[in-house]
Amino acid sequence: MKNGIHPEYKKLLIKVGSNIFETMSTHPIGEILMDVDFRKHPAWNKDSGNVVNQSNKSVSDFNKRFSGLSFDSKKEAS
């Protein structure tokens, strides 16, 4: 391998709440602070289903607000 063309492979700390996970990476910063705990995501945790309901409510509100908007490109030209 050529010298000087590969990124530096170093220790990376991933902070989730009060937990710290250590791994190796080529990430330029040595630390990542997670805003959302992946262990509490509704896809893996059935107890936090209200997050999905809130998301569905937001989508429903959006659809109500923009129900008349159409991006259909199959309209006939006059």
From Swiss-Prot:
Any one GO MF annotation of this record: structural constituent of ribosome
Record bears the keyword Repressor: no
Family: Belongs to the bacterial ribosomal protein bL31 family. Type A subfamily.
UniProt GO cellular component terms: ribonucleoprotein complex; ribosome
Keywords from the named record: Ribonucleoprotein, Ribosomal protein, RNA-binding, rRNA-binding
Gene Ontology BP term (one): translation
Function, in words: Binds the 23S rRNA.
Record organism: Rickettsia typhi (strain ATCC VR-144 / Wilmington)
The protein's name in its UniProt record: Large ribosomal subunit protein bL31
Tree of life domain: Bacteria
Record's subunit section: Part of the 50S ribosomal subunit.
Keyword field contains RNA-binding: yes
InterPro entries tied to this protein: Ribosomal_bL28/bL31-like_sf, Ribosomal_bL31, Ribosomal_bL31_sf
Alphabetized Gene3D superfamilies for the sequence: Ribosomal protein L31
